[in-house]
Amino acid sequence: MNASPQAKGRRAALHDLPRRWPLACALLLSLPLPAFADSVTDWSAFADEVIGSAGGPPQQFRVLAMTQIAVHDALNSIDRRYRTYSVVGPVNPNASPDAAVARAAADVLRATMPSQAATINAHYAAAIAALPGCPVAAPGCIDQGIAAGAASAAAILQERQGDGSATPHLPYTLAPGPGIYQPTPPTPPPPAPYPQFAGWANLVPFAIISRRQFMAPRAPELRLKSRAYADEYNEVKAVGSFAVRNAAPDSEESRVARYFPAGGANLNAIARAVVAGKSLDRWQHARLFALVNMAVTDALITTFHAKYTYTFWRPYTAIHWSDDGNPRTRPDPAWTSYLTTPPYPDYPCGLPTTMGAGAQVMRSYFGTNHLPYTLAAGGITRSYTRLSDAESDSVDARVYAGIHFRFGCEAGVVQSRKVGKWVYHTQLRPLPHW
């Protein structure tokens, strides 16, 4: 489809991330639990049901990465097909894989979200009770599986002790000025931390070497007097305002703006939808889910480091500012964004970061971008045939929501794809006999 009028004449579209107009076709909301083929996908879906208690999206993905690593390592302590993330010893090969998966996931979720203990305990008890009895040749298989899961969960929980997650937020003291991020309404009342996740750049990564390794470079659009910045400013001002979007709530632009923050960027739900019908086994599912969540977590570390390095303002602040020094921009003190602006700086964008990292892992895993899936979120169902189309829509969504400039969203995808490739090629690699 054709690019938006605002985009014409600007830099070339991001490779394999086409702009489309209109569109073709905090993050993890509760989604219906469909019946899946195995315990790994079942526990992944259950984790989505309780993960909101972990905190904001960066905190959620950290917990999900730990959970999926524990599941992966538990299975590979029973049958070693892939390198484990943590050091776990081998267990009886007759141990129940499903018991191991259940205990590994439940232990990490309980430890990281104690407020959900009752719900997790009930789900775990039901999962164990539903297991078939052990064969005569493998007495004690369920207890052995439980022990394997407990060991892998303990290993990753110990490894992530003191990883920096206890101090996600830091004081923010920059004074208002042209281009400088400032909190946007509605701000939470004290003592809620605002803005948020300045400390997330200090989180110990799961796989990348450092938070700077794939950090988005300084973009030309950060120069307020440039034509490039003016183009970005005028695009989001035109298409992301509450007045424009609310006047056409059922338009493609308005629907995609709502879809992604309502759960359309739930990479675990996307991964489960992608693998449906592919006849993967528990080991393959576990490896993919662990890689996706590690990549997203590490990409967000990189993103928040960049956000608080550049501290670039959000469209709301920019459009309200009386004089940014650019003759091609015109302030509007009455302008409001279609959706509420998240409480942290603009560049680069977080939601497209998650999409880019997770999608790249799946592309690398399956060796193709053509991975069709359908996912419902926020009362909207969308279908994609290529992962890059979903990434592209996630970029558009933040512009149509009025909460991001396009260049920051594209940068988020670019840097996170690099993270996804790194994670895939360095972590949980197949063992030689596989």
Which residues does each PLM region occupy?
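Short linear motifs centered on Gly/Pro in flexible linkers and helix caps
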Residues: R11-A12, P34, D38
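Sequence-pattern detector for short linear motifs
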Residues: A13-L14, P22-L23, A65
